[in-house]
Design a protein with these regions (language model features):
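Charge-rich, well-structured scaffold segments of protease-associated domains
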Residues: 1-42, 61-77, 83, 89-307
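Short, low-order "capping/linker" segments at domain edges
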Residues: 45-55, 172-176
Length: 324
């Protein structure tokens, strides 16, 4: 259950030796079947109704969540996943995004959310409403379909696509990950492919090549084809309705108490005593402060470990339509 990677300018052989001597050398490699099966495609969209808890005195009006969710390809299809990340921004999560704007204008919810998630074996694209009502479900679905059909028919705004690609390209070139160390982000990106194919850990680092290919496809109908295939003509879809339910927490707590009482009744007095003693020892361990000797084993930073130079922020000067 461990994935180890090294990042930086270092003596790799020395670091691997340290890993072996201090950590991994004490264990034997075992083969584990961590294969994850793909979920079979649905023959038709699946509708799911679930309850979620609200306070007993809280109003249930405009507290329903509605969502449409689409399974979109596979985790190792890197180009398609990057393309859907771009569509996420262009359609839903940028200023003036047509799908978001159409749903906001319909005034059927207090908030429009959603996006693309490629952190699983089968990535998903979701659109959901917060603060809505079940009676708006048909309108919700119709707005999604009508807006997407219009985007396919008229063509997605090429400048919007180009703009998002430029932003992604700039971030990758500059390794601009905010306050997060770039080595950490690179490692997390490796896992997007590495988790599902041990022979493909580096695919997500070829971002510039992928973005270059996607630039060429902006005016060739590629993005519109993705919308048609995965959002308009895709039966591997779920519609989820979350209903507010007053007092649900109390109901679930009572069910848990009944379950625990039944379990306790099935135990012998000796088994109960063991659980009580284990709990007592755990609480003692948690409440006992660490000794000075134990605290001294925690690695500490010195002033020499801190960088004296401040972060360098770069400004880019461009000219557009004669305006600098």
């Amino acid at each position: 259950n461990s994935y180890v990677y090294l990042y930086g300018d270092m003596d790799m052989e020395q670091k691997l030796m340290e890993l072996d001597e201090n950590y991994l050398g004490d264990y034997d490699k075992i083969e584990m079947d961590s294969h994850i099966d793909y979920q079979q495609n649905f023959s038709k969209p699946v509708i799911v109704h679930k309850d979620y808890p609200i306070a007993s005195e809280e109003s249930i009006e405009s507290k329903t969540y509605l969502s449409c969710n689409y399974v979109v390809g596979r985790a190792l299809d890197l180009k398609q996943n990057v393309a859907f990340g771009i569509l996420d921004q262009v359609l839903l999560n940028s200023s003036g995004a047509p799908l978001r704007q159409a749903l906001v204008d319909a005034d059927i919810a207090t908030e429009v959310c959603g996006g693309f998630d490629d952190g699983t074996l089968q990535p998903t694209f979701s659109i959901y409403l917060k603060g809505s009502e079940e009676k708006y479900l048909d309108i919700f679905q119709e707005i999604i379909r009508t807006t997407l059909l219009q985007q396919v028919h008229d063509g997605i705004d090429s400048l919007a696509l180009q703009g998002i690609i430029n932003v992604l390209e700039f971030r990758f070139r500059e390794a601009d990950f905010g306050n997060y160390p770039k080595g950490l982000i690179y490692g997390l990106q490796l896992l997007d492919g590495w988790l599902y194919d041990k022979d493909q850990p580096f695919g997500h680092l070829h971002m510039l090549q992928i973005l270059s290919e996607l630039k060429e496809k902006i005016t060739k109908g590629y993005f519109e084809e993705l919308i048609t295939k995965y959002l308009l003509d895709n039966s591997h879809t779920s519609i989820v309705i979350l209903h507010p339910k007053q007092g649900l927490n109390t109901i679930e707590e009572n069910l848990l108490k009944e379950k625990l009482a039944t379990y306790k009744a099935s135990l012998s007095s000796k088994e109960v005593e063991v659980i009580v003693e284990d709990t007592k020892h755990l609480k003692e361990y948690q409440s006992t402060p660490s000794t000075q000797e134990e605290l001294a084993t925690i690695p500490m930073l010195s002033r020499n470990d801190l960088r004296r130079e401040v972060l360098c922020f770069q400004n880019m000067r461009t000219t557009k339509d004669g305006v600098e």
